[in-house]
């Protein structure tokens, strides 16, 4: 049975809502207890894609509040708290207990609560005489957001900026690495697996992998081993492979335009936590949810947009035919057939029963069709207005050819599109072109200025490419470059060639992404010059024998792929396609520090440009985070 992160996290949440009691086979508690749920903003975002109000009601939650809102006492009712272990949350809990807001307090922290906070909680509740109110304290290890069965985010915003900030010192970098490794640890605890870890040598990926390896080793030696429950999985199947990369491994895929439905909805309509709003011609915006409960989204989110439009039309026509068929059978339309029986005849009664059963299904189908018609209409309007299809094609051609005709380049920059569309296109030109023509670059900059685009991100990529070319030349004989705190090295690490030496070299003939191709090679477990230098870490093996590639045992049927500095729906889709066409790996879970669209990643590049003095003041730039 394949790993399913959404299912595992949902099970943990349900158990928490039922006061951490064992559940019966139906997924509910043996004894129903009505309770109140208190959460912070972060944990609200964890719950949002997993549960709806009806699910909370099913598990006895009658009221739910944000922890930072003023609340009235509700006596004789237990309260379930689900919050991050922060100083402010801790003080609020102590204050709530001292006021006896609720009968009992069941405290659930999204990650492991530090010992000093635990002592502070004990001291605070003792001082106020409310210690008996605290029934239980649990570390839930749920500090991540699951968006689909195989997609998660640590919801750690602006990690790319923080990791690549030229002013960041060793202390700041180590704090970021700690946060990322702790988030990944939560994911592995929830899945109940201890993976084999692979990553490029040098750079953020190796730092996270090494720290995570140590965390897992320490935990496996502790008395309260959280991975014993996963033993059944491990005895039946091979352990999964965890592949860790950082965004600079393949920067282009995070910036480029894409014409497939899921990335397009995320990029153009701002899909967040599986929800989006679409402005119609009249009235307020309509809110929609897109997740695995939507059959059309599940079946068609990987298709190119024109194919989605055709599929919507097909589904609508099928719906109309089915409605007409129902009308015929019930005498509601012309040419109705009653099979020679009267209204109370057995056959017609059966027709009526079948019709009644089919009505809810037809109604639900119509809702789904209407939803995607609204979304597709909004997308089409933006595609036409911004020429997104043209940007997508030109960027793809640039990546394959390693450049673009100057006339075509300038026409795109002076044509339709938002400032951000043109900025992304210009950065893709920089990344994909092996030999930069100075006069051409100046013409691109002039076109961006004419469009009144903030060129900080463009200047940043140009500067780094220039610095990196000389940096690579002076260290060409270096077998390993691992001084992460040096900012230029910190930015590129092992992945220099992936960003600046012509990304077309990393693409196979079918335009397979570099990450996908690398994961495919890693899961096969065969000798391969492209990955032979990758670190191999096995937390279950003796430390002395854990670093060499000779210990790799492939192939791997399960993989977890993690991107530091921001993932995207393009990579996610590519990795899911890998499981469909490749014989080895059957299931891939994809995660990232946050899920970003192209504009959001370029905003982070722009902020780095400003920090390097390549644009306006840093304070003038605000980031709209991913999820």
Swiss-Prot record:
Belongs to the STXBP/unc-18/SEC1 family. One of its GO terms (biological process) is vesicle-mediated transport. Residues 526-551 are annotated as: Disordered. Keywords: Protein transport, Transport. The gene is SLY1. The keyword Protein transport applies. PANTHER family: VESICLE PROTEIN SORTING-ASSOCIATED (PTHR11679). May be involved in the early secretory pathway. This is SEC1 family transport protein SLY1. It comes from Arabidopsis thaliana (Mouse-ear cress). Residues 527-541 have a biased composition (Basic and acidic residues). It comes from the Eukaryota. GO terms for cellular component: mitochondrion. InterPro entries: Sec-1-like_dom1, Sec-1-like_dom3a, Sec1-like, Sec1-like_dom2, Sec1-like_sf. Coiled coil: none annotated.
């Amino acid at each position: 049975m394949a790993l399913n992160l959404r299912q595992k996290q949902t099970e943990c949440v349900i158990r928490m809502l039922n006061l951490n009691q064992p559940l019966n086979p139906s997924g509910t508690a043996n004894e129903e207890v009505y309770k109140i749920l208190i959460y912070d903003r972060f944990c609200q975002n964890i719950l949002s894609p997993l549960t709806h109000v009806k699910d909370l009601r099913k598990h006895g939650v009658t009221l739910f509040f944000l922890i930072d809102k003023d609340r009235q006492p509700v006596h004789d009712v237990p309260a379930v708290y689900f919050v991050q272990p922060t100083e402010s949350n801790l003080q609020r809990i102590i204050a709530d207990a001292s006021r006896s807001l609720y009968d009992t307090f069941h405290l659930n922290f999204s990650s492991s609560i530090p010992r000093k906070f635990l002592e502070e909680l004990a001291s605070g509740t003792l001082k106020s005489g409310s210690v008996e109110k605290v029934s239980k304290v649990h570390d839930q290890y749920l500090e991540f957001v699951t968006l689909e069965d195989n997609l998660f985010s640590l919801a750690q915003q602006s990690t790319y900026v923080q990791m690549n900030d030229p002013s960041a010192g060793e202390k700041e970098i180590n704090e970021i690495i700690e946060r990322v490794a702790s988030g990944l640890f939560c994911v592995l605890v929830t899945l109940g697996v201890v993976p084999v870890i692979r990553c490029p040598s040098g750079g953020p990926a190796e730092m996270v992998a090494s720290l995570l390896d140590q965390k897992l080793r320490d935990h496996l030696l502790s008395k309260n081993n959280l991975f014993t429950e996963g033993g059944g999985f491990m005895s039946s199947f091979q352990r999964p492979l965890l592949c860790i990369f950082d965004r600079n491994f393949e920067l282009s895929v995070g910036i480029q335009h894409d014409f497939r439905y899921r990335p397009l909805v995320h990029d153009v309509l701002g899909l967040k936590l599986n929800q989006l709003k679409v402005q119609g011609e009249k009235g307020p915006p309509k809110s929609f949810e897109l997740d695995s409960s939507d059959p059309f989204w599940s079946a068609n989110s990987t298709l190119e947009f024109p194919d989605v439009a055709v599929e919507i039309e097909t589904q609508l026509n099928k719906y109309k035919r089915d409605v007409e068929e129902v009308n015929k059978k019930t005498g509601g339309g012309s040419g109705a057939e009653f099979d020679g029986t009267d209204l109370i005849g057995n056959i017609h009664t059966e027709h009526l029963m079948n019709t009644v059963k089919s009505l809810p299904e037809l109604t639900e189908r119509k809702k789904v069709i209407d939803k995607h018609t609204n979304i597709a209409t909004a997308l089409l309007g933006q595609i036409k207005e911004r020429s997104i299809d043209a940007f997508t094609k030109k960027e793809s051609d640039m990546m394959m050819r390693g450049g673009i005709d100057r006339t075509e380049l300038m026409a795109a920059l002076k044509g339709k599109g938002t400032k951000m569309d043109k900025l992304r296109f210009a950065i893709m030109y920089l990344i994909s072109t092996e030999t930069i023509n100075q006069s051409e670059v100046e013409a691109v900059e002039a076109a961006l200025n004419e469009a009144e685009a903030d060129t900080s991100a463009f200047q940043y990529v140009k500067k780094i490419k220039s610095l990196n070319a000389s940096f690579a030349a002076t260290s060409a004989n270096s077998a390993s470059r691992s001084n992460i705190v040096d900012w230029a090295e910190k930015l590129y690490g092992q992945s220099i060639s992936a960003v600046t030496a012509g990304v077309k070299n990393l693409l196979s003939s079918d335009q397979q992404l570099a990450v996908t191709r690398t994961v495919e090679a890693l899961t096969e477990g065969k000798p391969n010059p492209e990955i032979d230098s990758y670190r191999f870490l096995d937390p279950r093996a003796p430390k002395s024998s854990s670093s060499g590639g000779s210990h790799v045992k492939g192939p791997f049927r399960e993989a977890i792929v993690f991107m530091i500095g921001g993932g995207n729906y393009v990579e996610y889709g590519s990795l899911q396609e890998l499981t469909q066409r490749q014989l080895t790996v059957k299931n891939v879970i994809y995660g990232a520090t946050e899920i970003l669209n192209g504009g959001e990643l370029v905003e982070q590049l722009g902020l780095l440009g400003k920090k390097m003095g390549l644009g306006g003041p840093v304070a003038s730039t605000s980031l709209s985070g991913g999820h």
